[in-house]
């Protein structure tokens, strides 16, 4: 934002100081390895964060791991075998972020490059099909934002998925200008509690919880 650095110079300086202490510096040479190391093999957040940095001009596309979005063009009954569950963080981010990275730094392999170019339209159709009617993927602001910014970043700001994502973000912003991580955490908190209790969960409580969880499932 124009003037933001000057207006919030103290906050920016404090953030840079913290990052320098945690990662060793604030250049891509320091931040990219630190982000990847922080999340390990889980690319759910490291790849979107690095994509955001690259789109903002604070990172390098070579540091963004290419997600194989072309896999989303395969038949849906293959998704489980490929560990691509439809209702998860995996698929929307795979498609949008994968396409964005491919747009800015395509593979050196001509076969892979042609394959991904051919899969772009099909996988965008899949992304449109799995987007809920309110535009929010899993009712989650981070995921919806990652998808929306990636589509805009690869030249598709007016794509229906991007437009619905923006509508969701506008509709879910709080009065103070912030967003909740998710608009409804009850399902997540309930499943975490059930997993924590394990065999100690009373038998008479299991059926009501199971029925409630089933009612939360999207059926679009």
Annotate the PLM regions:
Residues 1-220:
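Preference for long, amphipathic alpha-helical scaffolds in soluble/luminal domains
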